[in-house]
Amino acid sequence: MTFTPATGTESCLSAPSPGNGVGPLQRKIWTATGKADSVDSEEEGQDLESHRPQGQMGNNKSCPGQECSSRFLPAEQAEVNRLFDALSSEKLGSSASPRSFSLQALKGHVGDALPPEMVTRLFEGMRRVDGSGKAKGPSERVSQEQFTASMSHLLKGTAEEKSLVILNMISASGGPVKARDVHKFTEDLVGSVVHVLSYRRQLRGWSQKPPPGSPSRVQVLAAQLCSEMRLQGGGKLLGPQWLDRDCDQAVLEDWVFRAHHVATFLSLVIHQGFLLLRSSLKLATLVPERQVDPQREFASVLDVLSVIYVNSHLPQERRLSWRLLFATELHGNSFAQLCGRIAHGGPCLVLLEDSDGHVFGGFASCSWEVKPQFQGDDRCFLFSVSPRMAVYTCTGYNDHYMYLNQGQQTIPNGLGMGGQHGYFGLWIDVDFGKGHSKAKPTCTTYGSPQLSAQEDFQFQKMEVWAVGEAPKAESVRKTRSILDIDPEARALLEASGRGRHSEGLREVPDEP
């Protein structure tokens, strides 16, 4: 079988662009009855995160392997072929095709890079693809046609094509599955991401596991991804009562479209687990580099999964690196230290862990300034990491995105995001270690619920991470007090008769 590569320029993490010569794709997926359900999907050449793919059900013939593989560039197709040659090189008896590979061969190639359960799921998904349209049932081994078609669907396919492979990774029958089976698949997928990143030494400085005593972030992120699913009848997978509901291919297709992390994680598992087409994986924007002074390491409340999740909601240009600006473990429980380290430090993430173990925070889209007015813009958001993962974006109700003030008698002193004075979605008081998260029922600015375990909370751990490239004023910020940087704040303090006392807010700066 000869596989003809395309001449287009699309990435392995995106759908093919229109006009690249790829026609409608049709393929058959075997069901429990032994009959094939034909499925057509028309390539729309659109970004899956902004346009829903238009799939149609029909009875057309399945595509030949050449059409499936035509999505790969010449160099990519050659790499896919080389991997198949390596997998199918085992010596076989006369009864087996020499151009196919077994589950054992795939496990031997992957080794310990992926959990065995995920390798088995991938093999099951591949062997049930009928690339020729002539098979009478699922094969025991994976042919070159099946392998190429599967890689094409998972790395470059539409939400419909991905959902068909996922369905066969979950179910031996290829038919509808229970929501609990989708949930288990999602946990396996998320766990495989952590596993392979750790195995390939691609954690980029982040911890593989959350701090001791924290809920499993694998389970927390899997629950978040599953909550994006819309079950038959319109319900969401938000609790145990929904686990016995049926999920057919249409439900999975809609889910893959909504929860874009599913497709991203599948691509990551293939790229890093199979060592296939790794140059096309934008790992740097998926897992930001953790930048902390090696002489001043500390135990963060974050792990790699929570970082991946929050990072995916940042503006694209802010996803490459996170630089530590402030941590209570290093810089103490001081509001003055906090202000001095974050003011004019560029866009950043503020997060803390309350005394009940809830981890939450907010993204400040621009530099913090000490002043009595609200600041920021609609790129800001609030988020939760534990016990649940969620991001809450602006509602448009008001512009109370960010607030930072100190030394005033008639207006609140502290750091706040969303809501209003005395009723913030997230508030850190100048009396450091205290705060509140008020939302009845939700924060007006961000639509977020109460983020902390208690409305008024206490905390011991707080971190602030600058995201993306450092601002040009970074060197100024490092050498000057917040009272020097913000003349308005100093003038207000002096006008209130607190000018000399404000000098006491200066603290001997720690080592950066």
What spans do the regions from the language model cover?
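Phosphate-recognition beta-domain surfaces
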Residues: 58-98, 105-130, 146-154, 168, ...
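A positional/structural detector of protein chain ends, strongest at the extreme C-terminus
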Residues: 1-4, 510-512
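Non-catalytic localization and substrate-recognition regions of ubiquitin/SUMO ligases
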Residues: 141-143
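Extended, amphipathic alpha-helical coiled-coil scaffold segments used for oligomerization/tethering
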Residues: 135-138
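A short alpha-helix capping/helix-loop junction motif
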Residues: 159-166
